[in-house]
């Protein structure tokens, strides 16, 4: 028995096949082509959209990196400005402290000088008062030279004990 035998069923199979091709071509070619074309257009549109989205994403990434770099630069500048300001304030505080110290020293020296001068004036007044008292005692007693010297020594001793 041969593998392919040519008989009347073979003939009908060929006719059925061509008839099926004709029916498929006549009734299904356009809808299938339309579906295939729509699918092809949809895939192409999605590919174009994906390419567009990829470019947008790359641009957004570049923009974000540029913004990050700008922010870092700005942050660095802010830190440097803050450091400069802190250094200036430190120098100003040191300068003010030195000026205050100098003012305090000058004020203290002036006060010491005033106290010293006041003490000298007070001492001068006391010496004048003591001299006046001594002169008064000398006049009251009308003493001779020897008594006057002993009276002065006695008065000086009394003044020394009081102090």
From Swiss-Prot:
Protein's membrane topology: Single-pass membrane protein
GO cellular component: plasma membrane; proton-transporting ATP synthase complex
Keyword presence, Ion transport: yes
GO molecular function, one term: proton-transporting ATP synthase activity, rotational mechanism
Compartment(s): Cell inner membrane
Transmembrane spans: 3-23
Superkingdom, natural source: Bacteria
The entry's keywords: ATP synthesis, Cell inner membrane, Cell membrane, CF(0), Hydrogen ion transport, Ion transport, Membrane, Transmembrane, Transmembrane helix, Transport
Record's keyword annotation contains Transport: yes
Signal peptide: none
Subunit structure as annotated in this protein's UniProt entry: F-type ATPases have 2 components, F(1) - the catalytic core - and F(0) - the membrane proton channel. F(1) has five subunits: alpha(3), beta(3), gamma(1), delta(1), epsilon(1). F(0) has three main subunits: a(1), b(2) and c(10-14). The alpha and beta chains form an alternating ring which encloses part of the gamma chain. F(1) is attached to F(0) by a central stalk formed by the gamma and epsilon chains, while a peripheral stalk is formed by the delta and b chains.
PANTHER family in the cross-refs: ATP SYNTHASE SUBUNIT B (PTHR33445:SF1), ATP SYNTHASE SUBUNIT B', CHLOROPLASTIC (PTHR33445)
Family recorded in the similarity comment: Belongs to the ATPase B chain family.
Function: F(1)F(0) ATP synthase produces ATP from ADP in the presence of a proton or sodium gradient. F-type ATPases consist of two structural domains, F(1) containing the extramembraneous catalytic core and F(0) containing the membrane proton channel, linked together by a central stalk and a peripheral stalk. During catalysis, ATP synthesis in the catalytic domain of F(1) is coupled via a rotary mechanism of the central stalk subunits to proton translocation.
NCBIfam families tied to this protein: ATP_synt_b
Protein name in UniProt: ATP synthase subunit b
Protein source organism: Fusobacterium nucleatum subsp. nucleatum (strain ATCC 25586 / DSM 15643 / BCRC 10681 / CIP 101130 / JCM 8532 / KCTC 2640 / LMG 13131 / VPI 4355)
Lineage: Bacteria, Fusobacteriati, Fusobacteriota, Fusobacteriia, Fusobacteriales
